[in-house]
Amino acid sequence: MSDSKMDKLARMAPLPRTPLLTIWLAINMALIAQETGHKRIHTVQAATGGGSMLGDVNISAILDSFSVSYDKRVRPNYGGPPVEVGVTMYVLSISSLSEVKMDFTLDFYFRQFWTDPRLAYRKRPGVETLSVGSEFIKNIWVPDTFFVNEKQSYFHIATTSNEFIRVHHSGSITRSIRLTITASCPMNLQYFPMDRQLCHIEIESFGYTMRDIRYKWNEGPNSVGVSSEVSLPQFKVLGHRQRAMEISLTTGNYSRLACEIQFVRSMGYYLIQIYIPSGLIVIISWVSFWLNRNATPARVALGVTTVLTMTTLMSSTNAALPKISYVKSIDVYLGTCFVMVFASLLEYATVGYMAKRIQMRKQRFMAIQKIAEQKKQQLDGANQQQANPNPNANVGGPGGVGVGPGGPGGPGGGVNVGVGMGMGPEHGHGHGHHAHSHGHPHAPKQTVSNRPIGFSNIQQNVGTRGCSIVGPLFQEVRFKVHDPKAHSKGGTLENTVNGGRGGPQSHGPGPGQGGGPPGGGGGGGGGGGPPEGGGDPEAAVPAHLLHPGKVKKDINKLLGITPSDIDKYSRIVFPVCFVCFNLMYWIIYLHVSDVVADDLVLLGEE
């Protein structure tokens, strides 16, 4: 009741005549005064802006009015045009980028913008936008946005939930939240470690198709920002780009946004830990080319150590990378270094093998020289006996002179000397047969040629101990010495002297024969004709026996080169090949890996 009502009531009431009536009036007046005081207090609070009042605007009343007939389960404009949701991002940091897991982790602000007409209110001075806490999210509809390639994510809640809502008087809503997301990033490591990776974050509605929600970049090309303080140990952020697309799935067509960030790998770590050490290992393997080829322990130990070191380096490098099937650029470099180190080891194996073969040839040649010297001395004795005939001499026909088994060849061996006289084959064969078959003591006297018998006319065979001197145009000494070691190597001393198997001089008299064929005294039988096969008789004799001086020069070579030549060539060929490979490798891979994505906004040009 107001004061005027109280005055009116007092005038109308008659004056009390008893104390009880006075007490009743006092109580009523006290109750009326208390009610009036409460009303005045509420009026003062409203005038001073207390509670949820801003001037004459009640903020709480505005927020409470949003819940009247509002259903957060239904999107705005349901049944009408789709809701357009604008998106912006600002990347604060990128903490990791893993080649093994094929993912990257980034921390960013994620903002969404949309309009809900049900949240519009009348514009008042000073109240154009309402900033409310994250609890208000539970009372309104929000887009069901999710990250398609997300592996793991979490919200930041220190010290409170890092999220806010702004409601504009027109019904436009802004939602901002801080997120940390680990997203998958398929990588192509073909040019590793000179590669450039393009990682992306894809944004899409989980349940609403394009008939209900369409996403767009809210600020056009400037919707994505990256802090200039972003840094990674092995990568540099080159730039970013943004795309909008439509994805068709079995449940319908969906609107999707993609933010792509390109990274460039820093090569400092790999240069220090892999490239330079592997190059030095290759260079160390070349030290063996300057060591003496007889220093087998040093050269073998150096070669094996470098090969094992390269194997360990390759294994440790690939252990930190995913098991992929294609070849990476670092595999090309390490593989080439391994091949060159292994080739250095094989080079010494080749040098050792050639030195062993040459040493075996020297030993065989020295054995041949020793045996030839002994037989030459025996032939000198035979020539002396020809000049001074003895009763044991068996003189044949015009074809030659024969010395029996007891001749100058010593026990068990015989010497048959045939001296051609320039007669034809028939004449030589006829006299030879007559002398040999009848043993006529009065055979026609023949003139024995005094042509010296040289070392070049010696032919040795393995397995027979016999010697013969054959004419007519040249004299040949044949003897056989059993040499199982030489025979096991695919050759004989006879081959060494004659220059190989199957030559025209390889058909000597059989074992134990003291004379030649029936037509010739001691194997002469040919008159003055050339040896079998025709041509120059000295052509059948090996050149290294006709020219002993040249033998000493060529015997130290195999296939025209010496072991020392291989070391000399390797000192030049290996470094040149490695330098050429490095030039080609770095030029090609640095060029082909320098790829920048189209429409890329470089960092610092935002």
Curated annotation (Swiss-Prot):
Signal peptide boundaries: 1-44
Disruption phenotype: In lobula columnar neurons 11 (LC11) results in a reduction of visual responses to the motion of small objects. RNAi-mediated knockdown in neurons leads to dis-inhibition of male aggressive behavior. RNAi-mediated knockdown in neurons in the alpha/beta mushroom bodies enhances learning. RNAi-mediated knockdown in mushroom bodies enhances appetitive olfactory learning. RNAi-mediated knockdown in PDF-expressing neurons results in decreased sleep but does not alter waking activity, circadian period, or rhythmicity under dark-dark conditions.
Residue intervals annotated with topology Cytoplasmic: 357-568
TM segment ranges: 269-291, 297-316, 333-356, 569-590
Compartment(s): Cell membrane; Postsynaptic cell membrane; Cell projection, Dendrite; Cell projection, Axon
Glycosylation site list: 58, 253
GO CC list: axon; chloride channel complex; dendrite; GABA-A receptor complex; membrane; neuron projection membrane; neuronal cell body membrane; plasma membrane
Membrane disposition: Multi-pass membrane protein
Chief location: membrane
Residues on Extracellular side: 45-268
Keywords annotated in UniProt: Cell membrane, Cell projection, Chloride, Chloride channel, Disulfide bond, Glycoprotein, Ion channel, Ion transport, Ligand-gated ion channel, Membrane, Postsynaptic cell membrane, Receptor, Signal, Synapse, Transmembrane, Transmembrane helix, Transport
Start-end of Basic residues biased regions: 430-443
Effect of residue 283 to V: In RNA edited version; does not alter GABA receptor activity; retains inhibition by picrotoxin; shows resistance to picrotoxinin
Residue ranges with Gly residues bias: 396-425, 499-536
Tissue specificity as recorded in UniProt: Expressed in different parts of the brain: the mushroom bodies (alpha, alpha', beta, beta', gamma lobes and peduncles), the neurons projecting to the columnar-type neuron LC9 optic glomerulus, in interneurons connecting the paired olfactory lobes, antennal lobes, PDF-expressing small and large ventral lateral neurons (LNvs) of the circadian clock and lobula columnar neuron 11 (LC11) (at protein level). Expressed in all major ON pathway medulla neurons (Mi1, Tm3, Mi4, and Mi9) and in OFF pathway neurons (Tm1, Tm2, Tm4, and Tm9).
Keyword Membrane in record: yes
A GO BP entry: regulation of olfactory learning
Effect of residue 301 to S: Reduces in-current for inward flow of chloride ions, results in slower and incomplete desensitization which ultimately increases single channel open durations. Resistant to picrotoxinin (PTX) and cyclodiene dieldrin insecticides
One annotated GO molecular function: neurotransmitter receptor activity
Modes of activity regulation: Activated by agonist muscimol. Insensitive to zinc, glycine, glutamate, and baclofen, loreclezole, to antagonist bicuculline, glycine-receptor antagonist strychnine, and nonselective GABA and glycine antagonist RU 5135. Insensitive to flunitrazepam, pentobarbitone or pregnane steroids such as 5alpha-pregnan-3alpha-ol-20-one. Inhibited by insecticides picrotoxin (PTX), cyclodiene dieldrin, TBPS and lindane. Inhibited by ivermectin, fipronil and pyrafluprole.
Known role: Gamma-aminobutyric acid (GABA) receptor voltage channel subunit. GABA, an inhibitory neurotransmitter, mediates neuronal inhibition by binding to the GABA receptor and opening an integral chloride channel. Together with glutamate receptor GluClalpha, plays an important role in the visual response by regulating the activity of ON/OFF-selective neurons. Plays a role in promoting sleep and sleep latency by regulating the activity of peptidergic PDF neurons.
NCBIfam families per record: LIC
Sequence similarity: Belongs to the ligand-gated ion channel (TC 1.A.9) family. Gamma-aminobutyric acid receptor (TC 1.A.9.5) subfamily.
Oligomer and partners: Forms oligomers. Interacts with Nlg4; the interaction mediates Rdl clustering. Interacts with Fbxl4; the interaction mediates Rdl degradation.
Additional remarks: Resistance is thought to be due to insensitivity of the cyclodiene/picrotoxinin binding site on the GABA(A) receptor-chloride ionophore complex.
Name the record gives this protein: Gamma-aminobutyric acid receptor subunit beta
Organism encoding this protein: Drosophila melanogaster
Gene designation: Rdl
